[in-house]
From Swiss-Prot:
<dbReference type="InterPro" id="IPR053931">
    <property type="entry name" value="RapZ_C"/>
</dbReference>
<comment type="similarity">
    <text>Belongs to the RapZ-like family.</text>
</comment>
<comment type="function">
    <text>Displays ATPase and GTPase activities.</text>
</comment>
<keyword id="KW-0067">ATP-binding</keyword>
<dbReference type="GO" id="GO:0005525">
    <property type="term" value="F:GTP binding"/>
</dbReference>
<keyword id="KW-0342">GTP-binding</keyword>
<dbReference type="InterPro" id="IPR027417">
    <property type="entry name" value="P-loop_NTPase"/>
</dbReference>
<dbReference type="Pfam" id="PF22740">
    <property type="entry name" value="PapZ_C"/>
</dbReference>
<dbReference type="InterPro" id="IPR005337">
    <property type="entry name" value="RapZ-like"/>
</dbReference>
<dbReference type="InterPro" id="IPR053930">
    <property type="entry name" value="RapZ-like_N"/>
</dbReference>
<dbReference type="Pfam" id="PF03668">
    <property type="entry name" value="RapZ-like_N"/>
</dbReference>
<keyword id="KW-0547">Nucleotide-binding</keyword>
<protein>
    <recommendedName>
        <fullName>Nucleotide-binding protein Rfer_1653</fullName>
    </recommendedName>
</protein>
<dbReference type="GO" id="GO:0005524">
    <property type="term" value="F:ATP binding"/>
</dbReference>
<feature type="binding site">
    <location>
        <begin position="64"/>
        <end position="67"/>
    </location>
    <ligand>
        <name>GTP</name>
    </ligand>
</feature>
<feature type="binding site">
    <location>
        <begin position="15"/>
        <end position="22"/>
    </location>
    <ligand>
        <name>ATP</name>
    </ligand>
</feature>
């Protein structure tokens, strides 16, 4: 017989200030979740108990660094809920320090820890903001360690909303493989568990008729399929993942992000992500993300 907890799904959203938590929370609200922002950790378990009593099916909760003194309670609270059979997913939104500084500078909003940082620093306003961001990283390190990280440094708000919805739609007890293409020239994704460098493979960019296309287009796919090194790289990545995915699933990992990088994030990495998602789609839940094809700055709300 199922308990009442079996019908309750909880998504906890934490992360860096300015990383897009409000965008993610709005996405879940649109998906039918009952959403609460800035819930103090002390009220987390009582709030969940209340939702069980009301037979709420799906709840999304956002917490941030303003309750830093109580955040160490959260990992144990999540473990308690999981032991009760509650479906829990924890998402941590992140971005590079430079990206967060730019977002705050553009909107002229104040970081929630900026006062604490500036009290102990004679440096200018930008330095105080960087200090606040780095302090926040330290305070949230444990939450980041135990969550699925989403790097929002280069992503449109609409794409972030769609990505969050796709993540929460997967079964919580099953490992989900996220394949992500990216360009090394724009940095390695901060949410990657494994990174494969494919810049040594033949580059369609130097074929004039393929330059403006992407790895999702048939002419590019046909070109890369004919390259022996591309087939060998695909085989080696497939073997590596097949070797370790079972162990990761047994370790109760909910998500594993595999990032494939080339120079521009347009041809080779995109093609390999498409192929890997196809190869692993029968055995695992798979999601695809092409960072550079979706790239656009995210702004604060």
């Amino acid at each position: 017989m199922k308990s009442e907890a079996d019908n309750l799904q909880i998504v906890l959203i934490t992360g860096m200030s300015g990383s897009g938590k409000s965008v993610a929370l709005h996405a879940l609200e649109d998906a039918g979740f009952f959403c609460v922002d800035n819930l103090p950790p002390e009220l987390f378990l009582p709030f969940v108990a209340l939702q069980k009593m009301h037979q709420t099916k799906r709840v999304a909760i956002a917490m941030d660094v303003r309750t830093a003194s109580s955040l160490p309670l959260v990992p144990e609270q999540l473990a308690t809920l999981q032991a009760q059979g509650v479906m829990v997913k924890s998402l941590f939104l992140d971005a590079t320090t430079g990206t967060l500084v730019r977002r705050y500078s553009e909107t002229r909003r104040k970081h929630p820890l900026s006062q604490a940082a500036s009290e102990h620093s004679p440096l200018d306003q930008r330095r105080a903001l960087v200090d606040a961001i780095e302090l926040e990283r330290e305070l949230l390190a444990d939450l980041r360690e135990n969550a699925h990280v989403i790097d929002t440094s280069i992503i449109r708000p609409s794409k972030l909303q769609g990505y969050v919805k796709s993540l929460i739609s997967t079964a919580s007890e099953q490992l989900t493989l996220v394949f992500e293409s990216f360009a090394f020239k724009r940095g390695i994704p901060g949410d990657a568990d494994y990174v494969f460098d494919v810049r040594m493979l033949p580059n369609p960019h130097y074929e004039p008729e393929l330059r403006q296309l992407t790895g999702r287009d048939l002419p590019v796919a046909d070109f890369l399929k004919e390259q022996a090194d591309v087939a060998l790289m695909l085989e080696h990545i497939q073997k590596f993942l097949n070797q370790w995915l079972g162990a990761l699933a047994r370790d109760h990992r909910s998500y594993v992000t595999v990032a494939i990088g080339c120079t521009g994030g347009q041809h080779r990495s995109v093609y390999l992500v498409e192929k890997l998602a196809e190869l692993f789609g029968d055995q695992w839940m798979t999601l695809k993300r092409h960072r550079e094809l979706e790239a656009s700055p995210l702004t604060l709300e």
